[in-house]
Amino acid sequence: MKILAAMSGGVDSAVAAARAVDAGHDVTGVHLALSRMPGTLRTGSRGCCTVEDSMDARRAADLLGIPFYVWDFSERFAADVVDDFVAEYQAGRTPNPCMRCNERIKFAALLEKALDLGFDAVCTGHYADVLPGPDGQPELHRAAAWAKDQSYVLGVLTAEQIAHSYFPLGSTPSKAEVRAEAAARGIQVAQKPDSHDICFIPDGDTRGWLADRVGAEPGDILDGEGNAIGTHQGAAAFTVGQRKGLAIGTPAPDGRPRFVLEIRPKDNTVVVGPQEALAIREIAGSSYTWAGTPPTRPDQPFDCDVQIRAHADPVPARAAVSVVDGSMQLVITPRDPLHGVAPGQTAVVYAGTRVLGQVTIDRTVSAVADARPPVRDAGPADAAPAAAALVGATAGE
């Protein structure tokens, strides 16, 4: 096959490209320039896509003897990932920028350009696997290295995108083996640290970064009855499940600690309550996709596992596509309550190791009655109350 290897400058993508060459494919390397000011995108081991990373990728490509290019995707990345991240937070939702990048950049803009240029597939260093299904169609599966599995952040891929994706690291037992292989091949980045968190916020100060862009306005902290029990200096400074730093002047009647349950940008309030009020018994959303043929017909429930964070444990659940409030939604009911779930997060559904699809969460239903004041759903077009807990996930390579 003619393969376009996306090379981030890290060890995973370098070894993935090397394995593609070993497999006899016609490989070309490409590094994505995602910022016009790449020096701002790294602090120590945090961040990615800097000039240093581009040079590391070029050196790896030269070692492998493959052509190498740098493509400027900075404008598309700013519009589809960074601006989306800010807009979602302003709407009180919890975006996952790594999934947006996979959905709109690596397996959309990059893949589209690759196919236009005659490539058969895009190769990345993600820890996931593409395997043939019973009908011969490619399926997206978890990686053999469960601790490094990145199938969650690839859950946004459609069947067509999966058919043009190549993940050579999928069957690798561990990251240590990848590093050892890189060292044996003479790849200079064999011991380069993994990138973490959000690449365009390399210092990890998401609250400060957001405050610089959306401002910080004081507002009320509410209890479950809607009573104002304190004030905050900016809702973006809080995350769902947070306990420390609430600075509540009125203690709880039962003396128990309180946790952030929701952030409500429409009226600039933060709702707090007991820890058990974080439990969620149902999630749903209208923005869903399937990684192949839908598992059932609409209104026909199916068993699955649901995962709501990149490295969270999957939870057994029942799911169905149903009409809710006039729109088709994927509704998921976990066997046991989920905790700290926020609108804007992504729920990926699995059948064993296979990714079935995903949904962006618009609505959550508390497992605890009367735990919060009345709320409105936070759909994509409505900046309504919602939680704003940031879910960090490594971006993959």
From Swiss-Prot:
| GO MF annotation: an example | tRNA binding
Q: Could you tell me which SUPFAM superfamilies the record lists for this protein?
A: Adenine nucleotide alpha hydrolases-like (SSF52402)
State what this protein does: Catalyzes the 2-thiolation of uridine at the wobble position (U34) of tRNA, leading to the formation of s(2)U34.
Q: Which residues cross the membrane?
A: none
What is this protein's record name?
tRNA-specific 2-thiouridylase MnmA
Kindly list the positions annotated as binding ATP.
A6, M7, S8, G9, G10, V11, D12, S13, L32, G125
- Region annotation (Interaction with tRNA) maps to 148-150
**A Pfam family that the UniProt record links to this protein:** tRNA_Me_trans_C
Site residues by UniProt (Interaction with tRNA)? H126, Q345
What top-level class of enzyme does the UniProt entry assign? transferase
* Compartments reported by the entry: Cytoplasm
